[in-house]
Amino acid sequence: MSRHRIVRTMDYNDEYDGYDDIYGHSVEDEHCISPTDAQQWLYDRARGQQSISAFISKNKDIQEEEADEDEDEDAAFAKARRDSESFQMPQLDEIEQAKLSSCVDEVRSVVGDAVSERRIVETSMKFDYDMQKILDEILNEETNKSAKPAVNKMKAPAAPVLPKTVSKTVPTPPPKISLKEPRRGFEIPSPKVPSSPVVSGRNTPVDISAGDDISRSSATVFKVSKEQAVRNARQLYEKERADQKSHIHMIVIGHVDAGKSTLMGHLLYDTGNVSQRVMHKHEQESKKLGKQSFMYAWVLDETGEERARGITMDVGQSRIETKTKIVTLLDAPGHKDFIPNMISGATQADVALLVVDATRGEFESGFELGGQTREHAILVRSLGVNQLGVVINKLDTVGWSQDRFTEIVTKLKSFLKLAGFKDSDVSFTPCSGLTGENLTKKAQEPALTNWYSGRHLLDVIENFKIPERAIDRPLRMSVSDIYKGTGSGFCISGRVETGVLCLNDKVLVGASREQAQVKSLTMNEFPQTCVFAGDQVSVTLPALDINNVTVGCIISDPQTPIPVTTRFQARIIVFNVKVPITMGFPVLLHHQSLIEPAVVCKLTASIHKSTGEVVKKKPRCLGNNSCALVELETSRPICIERYADFKELGRVMLRVAGVTIAAGMVTKIR
């Protein structure tokens, strides 16, 4: 009851003190707008405002942008076309009509569609069908139109009005202005100025200004030795390699678990490149893990992670010798997560070996949409590989069935023909990588010899043609690996794409074009004095900033350096894409071993796949199986060549979200 007494004796006036007070906001919140803003922006009839322009009189005019030249040309072309479509020929007699028609045809053959039909007819009748006068009139008019200077429509800002001041002027001598010629990136001083033989370009900006001619990027000529400048590469090659076997690089591709590593491991063992002791060790270790069928695969899969997961993750290299060739085997990963590694290996290959699994259901899963059999074949063809050997592996799991072999061959033949391979450059070989049947000698299995009497796998490799090497071209070497050597400096591993490289040669490295001198050359762990196009070598470059060298950069000849740019035009073929390619579409650009983010900054034209004719200018998007000219822009400067100049360095691949969406050739460098 005590709490009831407290309520009865409560003074309510004390409790309501401050009840009507306002807390939590300022006095300005009671007004929706300040008086200054209201005076500037609200309409006041008393002030006599007559137009909306009074509200924005103090604001600057919005400057209009000039129209794009391409848009002006397209608009003029469209106007001329509409003029021609709406124009009707004048009514003339037969003779006059024949003269007029012949004049129009002859003028069209000279000027094309750039001039409207109305203009041609009027000019023809004006000069009484005199072709010389008609062409002079039309061509002079077109020349005058194109020669008009562009007028800048943007007005210059008005000069501020300053108050007049009266001051006593003191005569002063005119200031001396020293005019220095602007120095472009990577220019070397005159020979009169003493300079170090090794020029560091780590603080030198890269000259990536756009130009119409690619030779602008090679305008700067670096000093090289007299021997390097006058070297005859062809004579040197014949002197060094005349009595040696030809060298060829072969990449082994295919769907995951098709048996690529097992096939190559067994081939190496049968050819004597793997000792019995090493093979016995792999056999015992694989037995302990319950993976005895992987013992041949472990010859190439050397890392613990690859052996634990049972898949190849990086490109493994090995070497075999045939009667006439030295073959470098490149074992590519088959899993789709490691496609970038496969592309890096395929850029080094001359020929390819496609391994397919003949097991029921396995071939279908690898060949259907999303399988790596199809994607790998398209990738190697897009990267310039023309010769392909198809190995139908694990045919023993289906009892060496001829029907299964014929079924797989029929499906692959039609697909490979569409991918761009010639029938004469493709061969099909049945074998078993685990048992070694039909690898290095003729088949002995009766179930196979009943219907197959063709070549074994080693004979197929022996019959691959050696591609022509571009030895006479300037030096271009793509970098695939960088590591610390045993001596001073660090080593760069890569493939010599074109030209020749010798000891003590001076080279330019990457987009920075830092100059360095070759200290040592090794190939297959043997020292060399000269290496040539097609060789996989390691180069030691002392006194070089390692920050200027990255995987994917190009080593070039100082006399003809490789172009460096951030924007180029390419002719691409679009594969299956889920989202159409539009302007601003982000992609991953694959060029040799380089992986660089890029953007499709312009869709120039859609072109016909076979003829190359322009189907449509400036398309809005690119869909499946289309061919187009596009412009790509990278975030950093890269070294790249036109396909017409260097086929080896003019190919690019575009990938998005782990899927290859397009392949193309570089046609123009900005």
Swiss-Prot record:
Tissue expression per record: Expressed in ovaries (at protein level).
Annotated region (Disordered), positions in chain: 60-88, 164-202
Compositionally biased region (Acidic residues): 63-75
E.C. no: 3.6.5.-
MF GO annotations: GTP binding; GTPase activity
Region called G3, residue ranges: 331-334
Gene Ontology annotations of biological process type: defense response to Gram-negative bacterium; positive regulation of innate immune response; post-transcriptional gene silencing; regulation of translation; sperm individualization; spermatocyte division; translation
A Pfam family annotated for this UniProt entry: HBS1_N
Main localization (coarse): cytoplasm
Location of the region described as G4 in the Swiss-Prot/TrEMBL record: 393-396
Bias type Low complexity, positions: 189-200
Keywords: Cytoplasm, GTP-binding, Hydrolase, Nucleotide-binding, Phosphoprotein, Protein biosynthesis, Translation regulation
Region (G5): 432-434
G2: annotated span: 310-314
Xref: SUPFAM superfamilies: EF-Tu/eEF-1alpha/eIF2-gamma C-terminal domain (SSF50465), HBS1-like domain (SSF109732), P-loop containing nucleoside triphosphate hydrolases (SSF52540), Translation proteins (SSF50447)
Domain tr-type G: 245-468
Subcellular locations according to the entry: Cytoplasm
Catalyzed reaction equations: GTP + H2O = GDP + phosphate + H(+)
Domain of life of the source: Eukaryota
Region (G1): 254-261
Phenotype on disruption: In germlines, increases transposable elements transcription at both mRNA and protein levels. Results in male sterility: male testes are morphologically normal but no mature sperm is formed. Results in defective meiosis and spermatid individualization during spermatogenesis.
GO CC term, one of those recorded: cytoplasm
Assembly with partners or alone: Component of the Pelota-HBS1L complex, also named Dom34-Hbs1 complex, composed of pelo and HBS1.
Similarity remark: Belongs to the TRAFAC class translation factor GTPase superfamily. Classic translation factor GTPase family.
Protein name as catalogued: Protein HBS1
Native species: Drosophila melanogaster (Fruit fly)
Chain's gene name: HBS1
